[in-house]
Amino acid sequence: MSDQPIHLTPQGPPRTVLPVEDATIRHELQQALGAPAEDVRARVAEVVARHPRSLLAWRALGDHGRDTMERYAAYRVGYHRGLDALRANGWRGSGYVRWADESNHGFLGCLRGLGETASAIGETDE
């Protein structure tokens, strides 16, 4: 826990916006998602292997996982990578991470997917 105080504004808790992912990564992911249906998961996994910090890629891997456990694992990795990214961008454990900011979609998609898959496997701690 930080010894630094959290500064509140008249607008409420601070808002954190993740940086936009590199255009090359977004292009590679778009190409992978446009592959024939039987190849999408493998192509997305290749993007994740090349860019393991990409929250959009982890979200896509979770979205295209072969089963609930594979989806859960991908979303969980993306969620934890997202927490690291949020902290690196000033988030201190509280405040807004809004869907309205497109660059937050990878993290928030992983969070949503993690919640859904955790529920499906009876993981109540999530």
Where are the language model's segments positioned?
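N-terminal alpha-helical interaction modules that lie
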Residues: M1-L56, L61-Y96, E102-H105, G109-L111, ...
